[in-house]
């Protein structure tokens, strides 16, 4: 997946004492003026093309330090390279943490790893205070308009409110060290543009655009009184907002896929099976025919990208893989045959750690609670299958 191959920007934090898992006075400067200054300094060098290419360098700093003294002691330059010094480097490759190095950043890119005593050579020097420098994190399954609000709020609140909350949450996401997100369905193009143009702060967004769903599928958010739909029936509110696009038949799937590509989708999202939160489709339902799925795969392939699908069951997973789908979202009900097929096709398995605990969603009806139980029980088994069959996994 494109987001998984991105060269990520560094993320800096201070290792916390064993057992310390919460913020305390002097222990963290998430969202501090120093962090904001550093983010603005690096983002100033980025063009829209660099952001889309995944080359932006965005920093987040955690520490027990006196923010005003550090900021005032390190004057800023308007532009130019950065040299990060006095740090420990974790590169995410499995190697041991490195000490005695510095990192040079030029034009928003990590230019080189240098010895600790490397000369600045025109770069602004930023003392990291002995903190750990690590790659920015990827959230591979993110919904711009659902990250901070409930589905009910998303379906009933004013559109402006929804997008303002999304922008606020994007900045919070960046401050947590997540520098790239793969949006897996919804109206994220405007926020992506605002971030790219420096209007608001947030991670790089790889948008999918509207979730493409069959009638009665997991992305069909219409009410019962909206049925039936005739040739002159207007689009539903969720379709107008770009949350979902309903398509039945190969021709409609082609059209809706191409519309999202026209708007700037990095990848395409289809609903290939039932869900827990949806009102109409059973969890074990299989959605879209193989030919419909193949239509989306072909259209995406013509633009050099791929299709991901929401699906849980072995039947749905295998149908999607036969159609050429490259990313399975969820898949907690997969069996060994489906897992083996994912490995054989070289597909990505984008798992989410759904659990039935005190933080899980609360559903009023028994049917959805039962679906939730099945998915939660399947989560541990799915991770075990992914490890056993050496399947490429995405996290989010």
Protein language model regions, located:
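N-terminal secretory signal peptides
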Residues: 1-47, 57-65
